[in-house]
């Protein structure tokens, strides 16, 4: 009995300490909102210095709810950074019909887009009819052909931004990986032959979401790592020296890191709960607490 009581007391103390730490980190997260906004704008300015040019944003996903489960940070930041004249296209390769809820999930995707992109921007949601499922192998040539009809990649007067998964697809989901394969084929086919590509300045930017395949700690550390990075920037005795140095563009040009502010995270979570009601099951709450993807997106950047 004494051992049981002692265990309960120790567990209560541990829970109390964890709760206090969570509160402190959340307060810091809110407090650092201006810093987060500044970092996001600097990152986007580095990749897209001429934001008032002719742009079109394209998000290629596999299932309805991918946009909010994995891509809410970049959706929110691109929506804030670019003027409202820049259209935003969400291209979903399936209806998410594995459980017979296809039409419901298409409606939910449209509701989600309306909540996440809540301004006067032109938003297009286009849903294809590939059958989703872990055992469903999609024809990449067919997807690429469909994407080429929806993304005007050959128009050199229009800067195309294409956002999708990387080759691992966050969770190694075969449908997510197909998004990457199709987008990569689309831009690679466009880029050939090289002589043709060199005739025109780059106008296509492909952003592939980093999956952290071999780093499960980073993948599920919520927003903690980013808060620690901000704190380090503030307290490091060498920060003024480092900031005085010219940026290492060779190292940074191929990477884009964006973070939701606390308010944007709350909006994304509310979007999941209200728009994607059919997908709200108990384990999703754990995702919204621990997953890095609902707080931070990091991308490998390629220009063509």
Curated annotation (Swiss-Prot):
Lumenal face of the membrane: 1-20
EC class (word): hydrolase
Molecular-function GO terms, alphabetical: N-acetylglucosaminylphosphatidylinositol deacetylase activity
Catalysed conversion reaction: a 6-(N-acetyl-alpha-D-glucosaminyl)-1-(1,2-diacyl-sn-glycero-3-phospho)-1D-myo-inositol + H2O = a 6-(alpha-D-glucosaminyl)-1-(1,2-diacyl-sn-glycero-3-phospho)-1D-myo-inositol + acetate
Short name of one Pfam family: PIG-L
Localization per Swiss-Prot or TrEMBL: Endoplasmic reticulum membrane
Pathway of action: Glycolipid biosynthesis; glycosylphosphatidylinositol-anchor biosynthesis
UniProt cross-references to InterPro entries, sorted A to Z: GlcNAc_PI_deacetylase-related, LmbE-like_dom_sf
GO CC entries: cytoplasm; endoplasmic reticulum; endoplasmic reticulum membrane
Main location as per UniProt: endoplasmic reticulum
Enzyme nomenclature, EC number: 3.5.1.89
Residue ranges that the UniProt entry lists as topological domain Cytoplasmic: 39-304
Disulfide bonds: none
Heme recorded as keyword: no
GO terms for biological process, alphabetical: GPI anchor biosynthetic process
UniProt entry keywords in alphabetical sequence: Endoplasmic reticulum, GPI-anchor biosynthesis, Hydrolase, Membrane, Transmembrane, Transmembrane helix
Transmembrane segments: 21-38
Keyword match Kinase: no
Family according to the record: Belongs to the PIGL family.
UniProt function note: Involved in the second step of GPI biosynthesis. De-N-acetylation of N-acetylglucosaminyl-phosphatidylinositol.
Protein name: N-acetylglucosaminyl-phosphatidylinositol de-N-acetylase
UniProt organism field: Saccharomyces cerevisiae (strain ATCC 204508 / S288c) (Baker's yeast)
Gene name of the record: GPI12
């Amino acid at each position: 009995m004494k051992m049981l009581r002692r265990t309960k007391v120790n567990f209560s103390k541990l829970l109390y300490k964890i709760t206090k730490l969570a509160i402190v980190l959340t307060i810091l997260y809110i407090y650092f909102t201006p810093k987060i906004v500044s970092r996001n704008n600097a990152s986007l300015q580095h990749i897209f210095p001429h934001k008032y040019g002719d742009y079109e944003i394209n998000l290629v996903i596999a299932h309805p709810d991918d946009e909010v489960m994995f891509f809410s940070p970049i959706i929110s930041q691109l929506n804030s950074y670019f003027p409202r004249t820049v259209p935003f296209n969400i291209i979903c390769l399936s209806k998410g019909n594995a459980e017979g809820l296809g039409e419901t999930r298409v409606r939910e995707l449209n509701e989600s887009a309306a909540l996440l992109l809540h301004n006067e921007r032109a938003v297009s949601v286009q849903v294809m009819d590939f059958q989703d499922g872990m055992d469903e192998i999609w024809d990449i040539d067919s997807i690429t052909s469909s994407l080429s009809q929806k993304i005007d990649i050959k128009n050199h007067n229009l800067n195309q931004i294409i956002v999708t998964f990387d080759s691992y697809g966050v969770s190694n989901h075969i449908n997510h990986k197909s998004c990457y394969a199709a987008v990569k084929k689309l831009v690679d086919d466009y880029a050939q032959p090289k002589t043709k590509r060199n005739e025109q300045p780059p106008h296509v930017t492909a952003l592939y979401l980093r999956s952290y395949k071999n780093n499960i700690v980073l993948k599920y550390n919520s927003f903690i790592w980013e808060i620690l990075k901000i704190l380090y920037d503030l307290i490091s005795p060498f920060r003024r020296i480092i900031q005085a140095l010219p940026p290492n563009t060779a190292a940074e040009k191929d990477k884009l890191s964006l973070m939701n502010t606390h308010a944007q995270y709350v909006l994304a979570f509310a979007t999941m709960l209200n728009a994607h009601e059919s997908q709200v099951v108990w384990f999703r709450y754990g995702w919204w607490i621990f997953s890095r993807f609902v707080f931070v997106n990091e991308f490998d950047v390629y220009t063509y």
